[in-house]
Design a protein with these regions (language model features):
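Autoprocessing Asn-cyclization modules and mimics
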Residues: 1-69, 74, 99
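Short, low-complexity, polar/charged sequence segments that are solvent-exposed and flexible
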Residues: 46-48, 84-88
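Fibrous stalk/shaft segments of extracellular and virion attachment machinery
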Residues: 68-75, 79, 86-137
Length: 137
């Protein structure tokens, strides 16, 4: 069974308030505006840089986040103060979604999942905010 992770369509980018070593299990960020209030959720540290690392946030107290390092196949590495941080969807989420689609083919009379949710009208009718698909664009 897939691990449930939480998301926010309104999470604002932030930065690392102090450096962390590759062995650190917590980090302090500048702000957590819009971050999910439930756990776990994924963040990219040093977003879009060669040293980018995915971490899984397991709990938080204010702007101090407790994290699992080197998440989803990335390597735990040190990060400097000011490193860009972004709330992200990870590859495993897409794999889990695809597996769910495969398992639910032919459920409720749906036989052609390739044609599902192909337009913004279809997506809105399904109750999925179109803005969700344009996050980070």
């Amino acid at each position: 069974m897939a691990t449930k992770r939480y998301y926010s369509a309104v999470a604002q980018d932030t930065t690392l308030s102090s450096s962390i070593t590759s062995g650190g299990t917590s980090m302090v960020v500048g702000a957590t505006v819009g971050f999910p209030s439930s756990f776990p959720y994924a963040l990219a540290v040093d977003y879009n840089a060669a040293s980018e690392e995915l971490v899984l946030v397991t709990s938080a107290a204010g702007t101090t986040l407790n994290i699992t390092r080197g998440y989803n196949g990335t390597s735990a590495t040190g990060h400097n103060t000011g490193a860009a941080i972004r709330h992200v969807i990870i590859a495993q989420d897409l794999t889990d979604f695809s597996a769910h689609m495969d398992l639910t083919t032919n459920v409720h009379g749906i036989t052609n999942t390739a044609a599902l949710l192909t337009t913004s009208t279809d997506i809105s009718a399904a109750g999925i905010p179109v803005a969700f698909l344009t996050m980070g664009a």
